């Protein structure tokens, strides 16, 4: 049932770790969890055009460290850092802890599942052909070194009366292999005909070491250099 479970949750503590990294007593846990959700929702709403990939929240002693992974850091920082200071003040008002805000650039957005999904969603909302958007995303990921990618669209595709599912795959996407480094994202596109669900799986290779931090280290190396070229062909498929 590898295709039924979230690939990220399945690999936690195997080769990747959580996006919220802190410990709290039982009486404080619920408040801090709700605070994390509000901070993430606020950042994604406030920085819609910045291409937000991940928001990592760490809470060392009486502090709150927020790290934003973005494809366009200049949009968040603004001219002479004016925008990021405004963002810092707004986030600081949402937490009682001392805030530290960091910005990390995603150098290869074509290999980030969340950014690929957002790109497809924006194209669908601009009435671009869904097949063209899917193929373009797959081709860009393969060109940048992904070993495999799968894109799944579900809904009233092309304004059809009956909703259906279509997907494209290039290379390998081994969902059952725990050592596989698979990035996953689930995005929604709001079109005139209704919501279209977008799922993206990107296979970047295998991680042999059993370490929750291994994926983050490998991801940083992949952003700096090129990845291996994929093997195998694509297989388009449509499910009604």
Swiss-Prot record:
Alphabetically ordered keywords of this record:
Ribonucleoprotein, Ribosomal protein, RNA-binding, rRNA-binding
| Native organism taxonomy | Bacteria, Pseudomonadati, Pseudomonadota, Alphaproteobacteria, Rhodobacterales
Entry keyword annotation includes rRNA-binding: yes
Query: What's a BP term from Gene Ontology annotated to this protein?
Result: translation
User: Where are the membrane-spanning stretches?
Assistant: none
- Biased composition annotated in UniProt, kind: Gly residues: 224-234
* Basic and acidic residues: bias regions: 212-222
Q: Where is this region: Disordered?
A: 212-240
Q: Which GO terms describe its molecular function?
A: mRNA binding; rRNA binding; structural constituent of ribosome
Q: Subunit comment for this entry?
A: Part of the 30S ribosomal subunit. Forms a tight complex with proteins S10 and S14.
Q: Which Pfam families match?
A: KH_2 (PF07650), Ribosomal_S3_C (PF00189)
Provide GO CC annotations from the record: cytosolic small ribosomal subunit
Domain KH type-2 stretches: 39-107
What CDD domains does UniProt report for this protein, alphabetically? KH-II_30S_S3 (cd02412)
This chain belongs to which protein, by name? Small ribosomal subunit protein uS3
Question: Do the record's keywords include Nucleotidyltransferase?
Answer: no
Mind telling me which InterPro entries this protein's record contains? KH_dom, KH_dom-like_a/b, KH_dom_type_2, KH_sf_prok-type, Ribosomal_S3_C_sf, Ribosomal_uS3_bac-typ, Ribosomal_uS3_C, Ribosomal_uS3_CS
The record's section on SMART domains has: KH
What is the originating organism of this protein? Dinoroseobacter shibae (strain DSM 16493 / NCIMB 14021 / DFL 12)
Q: Gene encoding this polypeptide?
A: rpsC
Protein family (similarity comment)? Belongs to the universal ribosomal protein uS3 family.
The job of this chain, per UniProt, is described as: Binds the lower part of the 30S subunit head. Binds mRNA in the 70S ribosome, positioning it for translation.
